[in-house]
């Protein structure tokens, strides 16, 4: 039963590929939901059986794990470890999962107890060590205890670095290096240790250069530059930007990889220059609805999010639920979303003039129940001015009218970061 449930997602996507069914986020979520339901069904069937062997109890726990029933997973794993014949890899995996579960539940006492038990036994797998310490670091950060998160984030990061030496773990190691490196940075930053926070990002950038990962190099360099700007050290950030460009050209042995890192950094140059500067009025505004036209200067005292978007932009749609939620949750606290778009001369697959495009935008706003004003410009000057060459691009302006954040895209991590920024800016007076 476990093998079927565990392989369900992989088998379904192989089936979709054979049938030439296009991948979509909705399809992924539906497939995962079906997998969880199947695992839950099999887990409950196992619960009703008597005389389960030690191995049966272990796989019953894993079925609960797939179904995301943490309480039953923990109970089954504890039942498994209480048996006298639990040794080796399965027992260690059971302990590692208990650490993860208790960390997610903010039960730090039991999480650290099982971590100590895990560390005192063999075998110890790097992937499990990384995951356990990652979850504990995240839990302490969520509990507003960044100083306690540091030791776990540091161990998770060092472990993910060690994984890069094993070719079979390199891809996973890079993914975990990014996650754990950012956890270490955030833990140090939120603990008030600026030098250590900078060091974490610098080390991650250096590691990326060493293994030829241009995307990770850019990500670490970008986060460091934004952090320096946030710290009021913009001149140091711009010097760091030039240094990162030069270093990219030297550090990567593969010229194509070096050029990719340089291209990514140059695409952000406009944003670095705009951050920590006064917001510039939007040029060429033609229509503003349903509210009355305003200037950005008149909105001082509020936190403003300029969302540069277009009706044909798929990722823009992914941002709509977040923008809607934030406008409704924080509107009475002085938060304003403005959906900034421009005339494209197209609507619903047809060429249209400006008045008809406006009517289409009004219907679009109603259809998707977007509770904020649309700002329509005559041309792309506003996009160029704010470096919104990729859509969606979000610009956050603080209560004093200063640009504090600019990012493109609508990935979950980006939306999470934007939400954190919004709450921080609203807390400022």
Which residues make up each language-model segment?
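N-terminal leader/linker segments that initiate helical-solenoid repeat arrays
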Residues: 1-55
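Structural microenvironment flanking redox-active thiols in thiol-disulfide oxidoreductases
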Residues: 13, 318-367, 376-384
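A short beta-strand-turn-helix
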Residues: 282-304, 327-330
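N-proximal helix/coil linker or "cap" segments that precede and/or mark the start of modular domains
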Residues: 229-285, 297-300, 347
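Helix-turn-helix repeat elements of alpha-solenoid scaffolds
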Residues: 24-41, 65-78, 103-116, 146-162, ...
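Short active-site neighborhood of thiol/selenol oxidoreductases, capturing the structured segment around
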Residues: 293-317, 323, 337
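Alpha-helical junction/boundary sensor with strong preference for TPR arrays
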Residues: 42-49, 84-85, 115, 122-123, ...
């Amino acid at each position: 039963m476990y093998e079927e449930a565990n392989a369900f997602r992989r088998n379904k996507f192989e089936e979709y590929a054979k049938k030439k069914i296009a991948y979509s986020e909705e399809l992924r979520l539906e497939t995962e939901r079906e997998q969880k339901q199947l695992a839950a069904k099999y887990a409950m069937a196992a619960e009703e059986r008597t005389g389960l062997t030690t191995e049966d109890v272990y796989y019953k726990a894993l079925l609960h794990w797939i179904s995301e029933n943490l309480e039953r997973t923990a109970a089954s794993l504890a039942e498994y470890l209480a048996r006298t014949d639990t040794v080796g890899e399965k027992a260690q995996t059971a302990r590692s999962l208990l650490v993860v579960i208790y960390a997610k539940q903010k039960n730090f006492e039991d999480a650290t107890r099982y971590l100590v038990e895990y560390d005192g036994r063999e075998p110890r797998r790097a992937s499990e060590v990384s995951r356990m310490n990652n979850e504990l670091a995240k839990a302490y950060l969520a509990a507003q205890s960044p100083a306690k998160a540091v030791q776990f984030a540091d161990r998770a990061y060092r472990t993910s670095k060690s994984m890069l030496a094993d070719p079979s773990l390199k891809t996973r190691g890079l993914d975990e290096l990014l996650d754990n490196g950012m956890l270490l940075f955030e833990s140090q930053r939120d603990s008030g240790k600026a030098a250590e926070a900078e060091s974490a990002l610098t080390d991650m950038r250096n590691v990326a250069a060493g293994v030829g990962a241009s995307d990770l190099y850019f990500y670490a360099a970008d986060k460091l530059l934004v952090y320096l700007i946030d710290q009021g050290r913009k001149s140091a950030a711009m010097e760091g930007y030039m240094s990162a460009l030069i270093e990219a050209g030297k550090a990567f042995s593969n010229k194509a990889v070096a050029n990719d890192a340089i291209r990514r950094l140059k695409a952000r140059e406009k944003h670095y220059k705009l951050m920590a500067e006064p917001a510039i009025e939007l040029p060429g505004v033609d229509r503003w609805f349903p509210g009355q036209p305003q200037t950005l200067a008149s909105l001082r005292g509020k936190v403003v999010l300029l969302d540069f978007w277009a009706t044909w932009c798929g990722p823009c749609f992914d941002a709509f639920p977040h923008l809607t939620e934030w406008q409704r949750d924080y509107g009475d606290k002085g938060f304003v979303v403005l959906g900034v778009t421009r005339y494209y001369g197209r609507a619903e697959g047809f060429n249209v003039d400006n008045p008809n495009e406006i009517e289409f935008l009004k219907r679009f706003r109603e259809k998707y129940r977007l509770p904020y004003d649309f700002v329509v410009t005559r041309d792309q000057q506003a996009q160029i001015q704010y470096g919104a060459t990729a859509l969606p691009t979000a610009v956050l302006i603080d209560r004093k009218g200063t640009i504090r954040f600019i990012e493109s895209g609508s990935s979950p991590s980006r939306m999470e970061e934007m939400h954190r920024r919004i709450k921080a800016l609203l807390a400022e007076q």
